[in-house]
Amino acid sequence: MRSGRFIGVMSGTSLDGIDVVLAAINENIVAQQASLTWPIPHPIKEEILAICQGQSLTLSQLGRLDTRLGRLFADAVLALMRQENLKPTDVIAIGCHGQTVWHEPQGDAPHTLQIGDNNQIAAHTGVTVVGDFRRRDMALGGQGAPLVPAFHHALLAHPIERRMVLNIGGIANVSLLVPGQPVRGYDTGPGNMLLDAWIWRQQGKPYDKDAQWASEGKVLLPLLQDMLSDPWFALPAPKSTGREYFNYGWLEKHLARYSGLRGQDVQATLAELTAVTISEQVLLSGGCERLLVCGGGARNPLLMARLAALLPGTEVSTTDEAGISGDDMEALAFAWLAWRTLAGLPGNLPSVTGASEATVLGAIFPANPPQNRS
């Protein structure tokens, strides 16, 4: 079983940057050693958003974006390697999630698409890449998501305490860690995605820092109930979703039924939508003693306060307090999944994704031997 240094690369639905993490991994530990966030150029971000909202494009446009993202991921990895004085031979593999542009786990031909050519990453970094993690799970009848609960269980499960790990990225998802029971995990709905989309359209800001704008508003109950009536929220777990569903067009559809709404009130209502849909799923799952929050939403004081209020009797804290960086959690998870793939170990949890069996995930893109590199 190979152990050593792995790099994880994550570009999530929030599109707030590319997270790159270096970790030492073996069967007993995952020790984070360094990290950085690499910016996504605005034109690329706009192209990704357009695809996720169903805008048509040619195969040539998709191919070019796939290549450009692959180079961008490679640049992000190379920046971390320069920062840490690493040679390609110092790193066993890179685990790259890719950028999800479509995720449709229902229907007669379930599918998911992550772009960012892994061949580009392997060629330009000189390091073996493991990518395309989700489709093997879908081939076995699973949702292809979420995959991070397996990592949560490995690092954050407690022998006697009933815990849940909540990741509030663009989409929010939970992992239920109950001693003696199979791990469960699923998406709860929008996390930061609609909050970020609204403030971007209204103020040109990428996110609502410290929930300052939302805190100036009041919750619009009719709008909140209207959004909560979306049938997706009533679907049974396990379930998954993404920007192809909960996007700005979804929000516009609901806002079109009202007039004269103040921007800060809409922002406050979107924050409440995130908090309510998360807390409802926590309670439906039987609740927990401790809710460990990671992702960008863990730095949103309004969301954290509302979760604590909606979940009395539950200790709401961050994964940082448990020793794992909440900002780097998902990138760490894909470094760990790359290690499992190379070790021939399953990376999915059928109790989470609904797959018929546990399986090794991903495809391997080997680096050229050092003597073959120019």
UniProtKB/Swiss-Prot annotation:
<dbReference type="GO" id="GO:0097175">
    <property type="term" value="P:1,6-anhydro-N-acetyl-beta-muramic acid catabolic process"/>
</dbReference>
<dbReference type="GO" id="GO:0005524">
    <property type="term" value="F:ATP binding"/>
</dbReference>
<dbReference type="Pfam" id="PF03702">
    <property type="entry name" value="AnmK"/>
</dbReference>
<comment type="similarity">
    <text>Belongs to the anhydro-N-acetylmuramic acid kinase family.</text>
</comment>
<comment type="pathway">
    <text>Amino-sugar metabolism; 1,6-anhydro-N-acetylmuramate degradation.</text>
</comment>
<dbReference type="InterPro" id="IPR043129">
    <property type="entry name" value="ATPase_NBD"/>
</dbReference>
<comment type="function">
    <text>Catalyzes the specific phosphorylation of 1,6-anhydro-N-acetylmuramic acid (anhMurNAc) with the simultaneous cleavage of the 1,6-anhydro ring, generating MurNAc-6-P. Is required for the utilization of anhMurNAc either imported from the medium or derived from its own cell wall murein, and thus plays a role in cell wall recycling.</text>
</comment>
<keyword id="KW-0418">Kinase</keyword>
<feature type="binding site">
    <location>
        <begin position="12"/>
        <end position="19"/>
    </location>
    <ligand>
        <name>ATP</name>
    </ligand>
</feature>
<keyword id="KW-0808">Transferase</keyword>
<comment type="pathway">
    <text>Cell wall biogenesis; peptidoglycan recycling.</text>
</comment>
<dbReference type="InterPro" id="IPR005338">
    <property type="entry name" value="Anhydro_N_Ac-Mur_kinase"/>
</dbReference>
<keyword id="KW-0067">ATP-binding</keyword>
<keyword id="KW-0547">Nucleotide-binding</keyword>
<protein>
    <recommendedName>
        <fullName>Anhydro-N-acetylmuramic acid kinase</fullName>
        <ecNumber>2.7.1.170</ecNumber>
    </recommendedName>
</protein>
<dbReference type="GO" id="GO:0016301">
    <property type="term" value="F:kinase activity"/>
</dbReference>
<dbReference type="GO" id="GO:0009254">
    <property type="term" value="P:peptidoglycan turnover"/>
</dbReference>
<dbReference type="GO" id="GO:0006040">
    <property type="term" value="P:amino sugar metabolic process"/>
</dbReference>
<keyword id="KW-0119">Carbohydrate metabolism</keyword>
<dbReference type="GO" id="GO:0016773">
    <property type="term" value="F:phosphotransferase activity, alcohol group as acceptor"/>
</dbReference>
